[in-house]
Every structure is written in structure tokens, then in C-alpha cells.
Amino acid sequence: MKIFVKTLKGTHFEIEVKPEDSVVDVKKNIESVQGADVYPAAKQMLIHQGKVLKDETTIEENKVAENSFIVIMMNKSKPASAAASSASAGTSQAKSIPPSTSQPSISPQTPASVSAPVAPAPTRPPPPAPTPTPAPVAATETVTTPIPEPVPATISSSTPAPDSAPVGSQGDVYGQAASNLAAGSNLESTIQQILDMGGGTWDRETVVLALRAAFNNPERAVEYLYTGIPEQAEVPPVARPPASAGQPANPPAQTQQPAAAPASGPNANPLDLFPQGLPNVGGNPGAGTLDFLRNSQQFQALRAMVQANPQVLQPMLQELGKQNPNLMRLIQDHQADFLRLINEPVEGGGESGNLLGQMAAGMPQPQAIQVTHEEREAIERLEAMGFERALVLEVFFACNKNEELAANYLLDHMHEFEE
């Protein structure tokens, strides 16, 4: 019978197969038709309806009917030397991660308590890296989709919970929320994994800058590397030595702030938690350094929104760093206190409801994205591999409209999408 073989570039060709042919036989057939220099059988990967076909299975077992199509991809060659194989261990982990050690990038939002993805400022800040400018696109078609979450690559960085983290169920939720953040000894391995993933596309300083902008979230850092690092992250933070064990941490020096409206009036910037300046902290050594946040209506509203939708914490912290950098530095210095406060139960509604609405109004909304005719065809080809349109759109735009990168991600994480 006749079947069609499609490539990621949009071309296709036909071959003759038998229902009892194994996948290995089909690969050899493609090699003989197209040439060993173009499609060597050993490097071929065949996909049908979103699933990679195993070599030992047959065409009939995989339900490949006459005049149907399969998608062909080429596996990358692996280094043969032992030294090279040990050095590439981080790369293989970055490309394919078992579901037991990583969380799907596209998953329902269920945890009620979250951890703060806050990274301490490095003592040796790297110089700013140029932000890549996306090429202009001719607008011919419109696809309406929400702004995608970062999904170009999932790098698992298991971060242990700090001693002050809640115990029991809250601790479990914290572990889930923190599993995608790199910290401590895992940070260096995460940097190396991203460098290996890029294959020389980025230098180390650029990767460190992207991680700092993403508060050590590897997924968001990779997204920044493809789409551009926010300008706010390109300003190196001030290097600060850690506070000694016998002395309480002092808050950073206060910069002069403009006169603010009375406390009873509305706050024009809901994410500027203290428009009149930070209160005096550290007066009570027995209390948490950030306990003064409890009295802030803006923080109460932020906490309610984060507990309802944990994914808004990242953009909120980025905006907070712009509106109130002094408070952001204080949070970075006292992450455990911030985690404890952000996970405390929300009490009452009252005025915090209005502030919640103000914050929600400032969050990104679904927007119309223009695509060209070629990009629309690329989206349709990804759909033809057996994936849902919504998932294809999210991955395609998160991968900066790189069809091959999107296809690789979809195939590497298809077991997560099936769940």
C-alpha cells in the first residue's frame, strides 16, 4: 500500500509498504528511496498521530492506513568518546526529562500556596547583554491566543525547602512550586544545561542575566533567551555581602521618594506596596523581618491573587522590582520570611477586593497575534502530527515561531500532554 512521508520543512514523498513491514523496514525503505546521505535509517525518527513509532512494531500495529501520512525527523548524532558522553549528560537531561523529576509546563493551576521565585543578587554581576530584536513579520492572518507560558525547554532543578518552610501539606505544595526553580548548588548545573541546550548560541554571561531576570526559573530564562531579556534585568544589582549570624540584616539605604497621596486615598500603582517609603524594619529581633507586610492592603490583595493563581507571581515580582526596588532587595535577602507570608491564609475581603481588581486589570490579557501564510502552514503541520491546536499555538509562539524547535519540544514532552 502507499503512504506519505512528511518532513518538518513541509515537503512530502510517497513510499510503498506492506502492513506486516516493521518500522525498521520502513526506515530502510526511506533510506533507499531518498538516499543514505539524506535520511540514514539509523538516525530516522518516525511519528504517526503524535506518537514515535518503535522499531520492533509493524505498520499494521501502529494503525497506519493506506494514503495516510507519517512525519519524519532526524535524531542528532551523539558523541562517541567517553569524555564527551560524560560532558553531554546535562544536555540529555535538558532535552528529555522523565515525568517523575519535572513538572509539565502546561498544567492545571491547582496549588493554593506557592513559593516565591526570588534569586539573591550575585556578588559579581555580569555585564549587560544585548537584547535580541525580533524580526518584523508581515501580518496576513490573525490567530487569537493568550500570551503563552514559557515552554521552550523544561529543566528540572530540585530545590530543597528551607528550614522555615511550612510542614505537612503546605510543605508538599511548596516543594511542587519550587521544583522548577534553580538555587544553591543546582544553579551552576542549570546554567551548564542551558549552555549545552543552546549549542553555543548564548554565552555564560547572557544565560546568567536571563536567569536573574527570571528569578532563577529555568523555563522563563530560556524564553527570555529566545524572545529578549527585559530591560529592567540588564541593570546589574548592587553586590551586597551576607549578614553575619550575630547581627540582624539591615534594610538597604532608602532613596528619596516623591510625595505620596494620603494613606486613605487610592494608590495609583497597586504593585507599589509602600509609595511613602519602607517602614523601619528590624526593630523587633524576634519577629520576621518582613512581618510589616501584613499591614499592607496591597500585599494582602497580592497574596490573595497569587494563592488563587500561582502563575501571576512571576510577572508581579518583576513589576514590583520596577516600582519598588528597595522592597525587592529586602525580599531577596529574606526569602524564607516572604514564603511564609505569601502562604498565610487570606483573611476577609473588604478593601483588598478593590486592590485585587486593580492588579488584575494590569495583568496581560489575551491578544490578537499576526501570523504570515508560512507561519500558518507551519502551525498546521504541527497540528498534523497529532497535537491539539491550542497546545501547538502555545508551543509555537513560545519557541519564537521556530517550527523545528516546537516540533522537538512537542515530541520530547508528549507523555506529559497525554496525562
UniProtKB/Swiss-Prot annotation:
GO biological process terms held by the UniProt record? nucleotide-excision repair; proteasome-mediated ubiquitin-dependent protein catabolic process; response to UV; UV protection
Q: SUPFAM superfamilies of this UniProt entry?
A: UBA-like, Ubiquitin-like, XPC-binding domain
Gene Ontology CC annotations of this record: cytoplasm; cytosol; nucleus
Q: Where is the STI1 domain?
A: 288-331
Localization annotation? Nucleus; Cytoplasm
**Outcome when changing residue 8 to A:** Abolishes interaction with RPN10
* Ranges of compositional bias, category Pro residues: 119-135
Domain spans labelled UBA: 185-228, 372-413
Its primary localisation, in coarse terms, equals: nucleus
Name of the protein in question: Ubiquitin receptor RAD23c
Gene symbol of the encoding locus: RAD23C
